[in-house]
Amino acid sequence: MTNHPANGLDDVVHQRVRLGILTIAHEARRVEFGYLRTNLDLTAGNQSQHLTVLDNAGLISIEKGYEGKRARTWVSLTPAGNTALRDEIAQLKRLINQIDRNDKRRKREQPT
């Protein structure tokens, strides 16, 4: 018996906000905290919790510094984060393919 594709989804990556953070971080070398917060419609506290989960899992790196006199926090995808994101996408594609196959099978089985 084969495993259902849903079993391959990573709970750390798959959560909506964390998947969004990883996806946006994949688009740029590094992304600023405020940009993530605005684009994912998050509170600073909620975003910080998700960043901590991803950082603890080794999927992102967090860099704090200054831009002029303003404190900034930047997020970057680590190589492990890139692999985890790609693995998650592959599992989602498997899940979609299974749904498509089931839909086609059901259409064939419908009485005419």
Positions of predicted regions on the chain:
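Short, hydrophobic-biased segments on the C-terminal half of alpha helices
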Residues: L51-T52
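Glycine-centered, phosphate/nucleic-acid-interacting loop/turn motifs that mediate DNA/RNA or nucleotide
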Residues: G58
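N-terminal helix-turn-helix DNA-binding core of bacterial DNA-binding proteins
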Residues: P5-N46, Y66-S76
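Short beta-strand "wing" residues that participate in macromolecule-binding interfaces
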Residues: I62
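Amphipathic alpha-helical dimerization/coiled-coil segments
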Residues: M1-A6, T23, N82-T112
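Accessory beta->alpha helical hairpin/"wing" motif in late/C-terminal subdomains of nucleic-acid enzymes
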Residues: L77-G81
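Intrinsically disordered, low-complexity regions enriched in polar/acidic and amide residues
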Residues: H14, N46-S48, A90, E109
